[in-house]
Design a protein with these regions (language model features):
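N-terminal Sec-pathway targeting helices
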Residues: 1-14
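Low-complexity intrinsically disordered segments
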Residues: 2, 19-20, 51
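Alpha-helical transmembrane segments in eukaryotic/viral proteins
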Residues: 4, 22-25
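Bacterial N-terminal signal peptides
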Residues: 14-23
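Solvent-exposed, non-transmembrane regions of membrane-associated and secreted proteins
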Residues: 24-232
Length: 232
């Protein structure tokens, strides 16, 4: 049985050129801005998750990417996790370096690639479930045309359709010995004035973080809430 980590934040950051983010900050609030319906979506993953039952009886699809994670790490020791987002067709390793700019134009094998790879914020600690920071950030490129069938995190624009989010509510992050399930509870576009990459906001910073997420969130999720106790 998988324990659900209550927050992931699909945040699409438009202020950084060709740069997007996929961390999901969830919540259940009425917003003035309506989500944008993007036609022509083709949501499909590379493999079908297997269901597992939660204590409440809800069936949550679970995945196992430990073999893929181990293989990727054998090829590149900078590999720290495996990211699986079925709705965005993401099923790839996550790198991490001492500088966030290192993998900007390098793929997971360390070779030049215009669209880079997925990589974690250099200040995040990514190990076991218990070692995750309060706020984990994963970076990836996004094309300026916002094509929901485009490269890398450009596909996150599919999540601007509320119905699509309901059909694809989970994101998976595999770390050493554990396959984590995150539930999407918020969606919004932000600029870099919001410090959304702070690994461990505390006190007033933490309160401000969640209040900002609540204010920016576009979608309502019936029965799904988030709080300062959650990991994002």
């Amino acid at each position: 049985m998988k324990r659900i980590t209550r927050i992931i934040r699909p945040i699409i950051c438009m202020a950084v050129l060709l740069f997007a983010m996929t961390t999901a900050v969830m919540g259940c609030y009425q917003k003035e801005t309506e989500p944008i319906d993007i036609p022509g979506r083709t949501p499909s993953g590379t493999s079908a998750p297997q269901p597992s039952a939660t204590p409440a009886g809800e069936v949550i699809p679970s995945v196992d990417r430990q073999a893929e994670l181990a293989e990727a790490r054998a090829k590149n020791p900078d590999t720290v996790a495996w990211l699986y987002i079925p709705g965005a067709e993401v099923d790839d390793p996550v790198m991490q370096a001492e500088d966030n700019g290192y993998y900007l134009k390098l793929d997971e094998n360390g070779e030049y690639a215009m669209w880079g790879c997925y990589y974690a914020h250099c200040e995040n600690e990514i190990g076991s479930r218990d070692k995750l920071d309060k706020n984990t950030t994963i970076f990836g490129h996004s094309a300026s045309n916002c094509d929901p069938d485009g490269v890398r995190f450009t596909k996150l624009y599919r999540y601007m359709d509320a119905d699509f989010v309901k059909e694809n509510p989970y994101i998976y992050l595999s770390v050493d010995g554990d396959d984590l399930i995150f539930q999407i509870t918020a969606l919004f576009i932000t600029d870099i004035e919001f410090d959304y990459i702070n690994p461990n906001p505390i006190g007033g910073e933490l309160t401000d973080f969640f209040q900002t997420v609540e204010r920016k969130n576009w979608l309502d999720f019936d029965g799904v809430t988030f709080s300062e106790e959650d990991t994002v």
